[in-house]
Regions:
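Short, solvent-exposed loop/turn and secondary-structure capping segments
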Residues: 101-105, 171, 198
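...with weaker cross-activation on analogous glycine-rich loops/strands in unrelated enzymes
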Residues: 112-184
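Hydrophobic/aromatic-lined pockets within catalytic cores
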Residues: 68-69, 93-98, 158, 162, ...
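Active-site-adjacent structural elements in enzyme catalytic domains
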Residues: 1-71, 76-95, 150-152
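Extended boundary segments
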Residues: 74-123
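Active-site scaffold segments
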Residues: 86-95, 168-172, 186-188
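Low-complexity, Gly/Ser/Thr/Pro-rich intrinsically disordered linker/tail segments
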Residues: 182-193, 198-217
Length: 217
C-alpha cells in the first residue's frame, strides 16, 4: 500500500522521498536561524571599540592654579621623598584633565595610578617614569612629543639632564606680545610655583614638551 503525507507529498515507502524531505527541512531550519540571527540577534550587538576619553587641558590648568600652593589633602606630599612635582602633575591630568587611572602593579611604570602613598605606580610620582609610561606600549595616555610653539593649557613640560627628566611642570597659561606668543606660564611643586614665567624661572634648562590629547580608558 502506498502511504503518503498529504500536506508534504512524502512517500513513506520511498527512502529517497523521505531523505529529500528531511534535507528540505534541515535547509529551511538553517535558513530560518541564519536569518533570525542576523536580523534579531546580531544586528543590535556593537563590535568592541576602545573607549577614548578626551583630555581637558583647560580644566587641568585650573586644577594646577588651585593646588599649586594649596596641596590637595587626598594625596600624600612627597616633598622630602624625591619631590612632589610629578605627583602634582599626575593629579592635574587626573583630577582636572579627566584622564582615568590605569591600575596595575605598584611601583612599576607599566601603569599609572595612585591609591595611597604605598600603593601607586612609579609613573605617578617619577618624572622620567611618567615620560616612559606615556610613550610605552602599555600606556593608555595618548600624547605627542611637542615643542614650545605648540604646547597649550594642561600640557607637560619636563626639565631634563643627560636626556632624562628630573622635574615636571604643567602649562597654566600663555603670554602674548604684539609679535605673538612670547612665554609660557607654568605651575609646579617642589619648588612650589604658581603661574610663573617659564623663561624667567627656568632659563637655560633643557626641556621637553609633551602634548596630552586623550586616554584609551
Amino acid at each position: 500500500m502506498k502511504v503518503q503525507l498529504e500536506d508534504t507529498g512524502v512517500n513513506l515507502n520511498n527512502i529517497d522521498s523521505i531523505r529529500d524531505y528531511r534535507n528540505d527541512i534541515l535547509t529551511n531550519v538553517r535558513k530560518y536561524f541564519s536569518d533570525t540571527m542576523s536580523t534579531e540577534i546580531l544586528s543590535p550587538v556593537e563590535t568592541y571599540t576602545a573607549k577614548t576619553t578626551t583630555y581637558d587641558g583647560g580644566a587641568a590648568s585650573t586644577y594646577a592654579l588651585n593646588h599649586a600652593l594649596n596641596y590637595n589633602p587626598d594625596y600624600a606630599d612627597f616633598n622630602g621623598f624625591g619631590g612632589d612635582c610629578t605627583n602634582f602633575v599626575s593629579q592635574c591630568l587626573y583630577e582636572g584633565g579627566g584622564l582615568p587611572m590605569h591600575y596595575g602593579t605598584p611601583y612599576t611604570k607599566t601603569c599609572w595610578y595612585y591609591t595611597t602613598s604605598t600603593n601607586r605606580s612609579s609613573s605617578w610620582t617619577g618624572a622620567e617614569e611618567l615620560y616612559d609610561y606615556i610613550f610605552s606600549n602599555s600606556s593608555k595616555i595618548n600624547a605627542n612629543i611637542s615643542n614650545w610653539n605648540s604646547v597649550s593649557f594642561g600640557d607637560i613640560i619636563q626639565l631634563t639632564s643627560g636626556g632624562e627628566g628630573y622635574h615636571s611642570l604643567i602649562v597654566s597659561g600663555i603670554q602674548y606680545s604684539s609679535y605673538g606668543k612670547s612665554d609660557l606660564l607654568v605651575c609646579a611643586h617642589t619648588a612650589d610655583r604658581r603661574h610663573v614665567s617659564l623663561a624667567s624661572y627656568y632659563p637655560g634648562s633643557n626641556k621637553r614638551y609633551i602634548d596630552i590629547t586623550s586616554s584609551d580608558l
